[in-house]
């Protein structure tokens, strides 16, 4: 069997395909999963999508155009919450509240939070379309944003797949070091 034939069973990963699959999976009742040592209810609370007028007002308030994949997400669901209450992707109102509260560069908007990781997840609005424009920052401890090398679509797919965990840190161990030059 050729690789192309096997790939017919898979779909192109787009914001629309991710959210469609999420909505279908979300309709399953009483699903529990293993999550960091315990069973938790699996599911998502999806908000009503933002209107074109709400999106225009949002872009006007922040002074930047948002990436098309992120705009597509907001049109489908203006934010979503994980039912384990650990992570969420913010709605426009919450984004604007963060925009006013936190002293971040104006081109960095907080779009998601992860409580267990104590992180804000942001889009760099100065990045070009479909660029690695997603960053994380600890709002208390960090002096800088760290790129997680994803555009919004890739971030959304991974963040939902791992149920809001900080997947960008998996496998990262700064305590295990090896000298690159033998002494």
Write out the residue ranges for each language-model feature.
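A surface-exposed partner-binding patch
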Residues: 1-121
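Long, low-complexity, intrinsically disordered segments enriched in glycines and aromatic residues
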Residues: 76-183
């Amino acid at each position: 069997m050729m690789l192309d034939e096997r790939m017919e069973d898979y779909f192109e990963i787009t914001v629309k395909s991710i959210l469609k699959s999420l909505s279908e999976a979300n309709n399953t009742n009483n699903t529990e999963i293993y999550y960091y040592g315990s069973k938790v209810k699996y599911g998502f609370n999806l908000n009503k999508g933002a209107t074109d007028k709400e999106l225009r007002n949002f872009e006007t308030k922040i002074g930047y155009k948002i990436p098309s994949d992120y705009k597509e997400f907001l049109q489908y669901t203006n934010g979503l919450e994980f039912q384990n209450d650990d992570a969420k992707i913010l709605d426009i109102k919450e984004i604007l509240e963060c925009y006013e509260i936190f002293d971040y560069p104006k081109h960095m908007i907080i779009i998601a939070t992860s409580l267990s990781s104590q992180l804000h997840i942001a889009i760099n609005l100065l990045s070009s379309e479909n660029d690695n424009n997603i960053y994380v920052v600890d709002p208390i401890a960090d002096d800088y944003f760290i790129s997680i090398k994803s555009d919004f679509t890739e971030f959304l797919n991974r963040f939902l797949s791992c149920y809001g965990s900080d997947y960008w840190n998996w496998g990262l161990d700064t305590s295990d070091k090896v000298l690159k030059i033998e002494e």
